Amino acid sequence: MSDQPPAENADVRQRRAPESPVTERLRAPARDDARPTSDESDMEGILQDEDSDAGSKNKEEKLERLTQAIPQDKGSLGVFADSMLEALPPRWRNWVVRGLFSIIMISTFTFIVTRGATWLMFLVFLIQFKCFQEIISIGLAVYRLYDFPWFRALSWYFLLTSNYFFFGESLIDYWGIVLKKDNFLHFLVAYHRLVSFALYCIGFVSFVLSLRKGYYMRQFSLFAWTHLTLLLIVSQSFFIIQNIFQGLIWFLAPVAMIICCDIMSYMFGFFWGKTPLIKLSPKKTWEGFIGGAFSTVVFGILLSLALYNRPFFVCPVQHYQTDSSNCTIPLAFQLQDYPVPRPFSFVYKILRKEPIIQLCPFVFHSIALSLFASILGPFGGFFASGFKRAFKIKDFGDVIPGHGGLMDRFDCQLLMGTFVMVYIHSFIRVPDASKLLKQIMTLEPQDQLNIFNLLQSELSKTGLI
């Protein structure tokens, strides 16, 4: 086989298919005046951070600046108290600080519970605002938008709008009962969804008008950050307040179970913890997890036995506010007869007693709530730990010495509030006759008569009248 002449080979190498305009632009040398935008610089910085050692240093510097922008808990109690704890090892110093502020928080919470539903709702809103502020502050630091004052204001505007959408109708009904006024702010209830949507549209248009060239990526990222935070924070606080309306015990018991699980898991892990539980939280141990779960179930049973016969805790809020002296105890809190399990029935036979035990159903409900609080509740904390690790921060804030921010204390409550609401709707809640009557009375007179005639006809068929 004969080789081709060199000249022909050179000609073949020089012949190429015509390039598209896009390819030509990509191959064209960069111009001196072609400067990347702010968003492009961010993307280039991210790629450099992932692919080079120099980028790794830049990443550490950025994370250090982020940590400086977000207050971190140092476990300090002030100069005088710190000097008293100075001789203790850091581990025990942290134990004392955490224990002291745990006692303060539990005492404050107990006082607020005794003041009733209104105080508890204000507490939920206060915690909601602070948790929202902590998460939004992290977003503003990450996307470096502190020099956009209107963006921070927009985030808070969306929070207020979301609260009005979620809480408008229920809180107006509640305050109508408290103030003993019929049709309280009825015009807001009638057009609640329209007003909510109009308020959201104002915020949406304001966001679009605030967009600046070179900051689009950051602004849209924080817009999504804000809405995800609203979904997590506002919706959960809405569920928690709905639980309060069902009776204070549906708020108090789950919250107390989470607190018990946190404390006992910490205690068991502090003294006996050796086996790591999850990489996201290296300090969490299997010993603490199991000890906390067992303690929470026992605590839940004891708490249910202590509160089941107290109308202040078990009556739905609207019924208790209307007539606290004649509140009908819900079925879940009325004593019922249950047969003693066979392995233990022989004890009753020896004592010549009928093998029946009286318990209220809420004792069994408390076991289900305790198991969720101790087994799945901690995953809210693991989720928060993963979030903090993603941004290389230790705490969401420093408002509570020894604990961090409020979000650090209430991360486990997020899942719990939703579970209790789902549990109530699945196993406990029954239609509220007074609420149905109130809705009927808002109808036109002819519609009210139609409902009366239809109801009378159905009751006659069933033989009730």
Swiss-Prot record:
Swiss-Prot/TrEMBL GO biological process terms: CDP-diacylglycerol biosynthetic process
Segments of this protein annotated with the region Disordered: 1-60
Topology term for the membrane: Multi-pass membrane protein
Catalytic activity: a 1,2-diacyl-sn-glycero-3-phosphate + CTP + H(+) = a CDP-1,2-diacyl-sn-glycerol + diphosphate
Transmembrane residue ranges: 95-117, 121-143, 158-178, 187-207, 214-234, 239-259, 288-308, 367-387
Any one Gene Ontology cellular component term annotated for this protein: endoplasmic reticulum membrane
Annotated metabolic or biological route of this protein: Phospholipid metabolism; CDP-diacylglycerol biosynthesis; CDP-diacylglycerol from sn-glycerol 3-phosphate: step 3/3
UniProt note: phenotype after gene disruption: Reduced levels of phosphatidylinositol. No effect on two-cell stage nuclear morphology. Significant rescue of the nuclear morphology defects resulting from inhibition of cnep-1 or partial inhibition of lpin-1 but does not rescue the nuclear envelope disassembly defects observed following depletion of npp-12.
One Gene Ontology term of the molecular function aspect: phosphatidate cytidylyltransferase activity
Protein keywords: Lipid biosynthesis, Lipid metabolism, Membrane, Nucleotidyltransferase, Phospholipid biosynthesis, Phospholipid metabolism, Transferase, Transmembrane, Transmembrane helix
Basic and acidic residues bias spans: 10-38
Subcellular location: Membrane
Function as written in the Swiss-Prot or TrEMBL entry: Provides CDP-diacylglycerol, an important precursor for the synthesis of phosphatidylinositol (PtdIns).
Similarity comment text for this entry: Belongs to the CDS family.
Protein name stated in the entry: Phosphatidate cytidylyltransferase
Biological classification of the source: Eukaryota, Metazoa, Ecdysozoa, Nematoda, Chromadorea
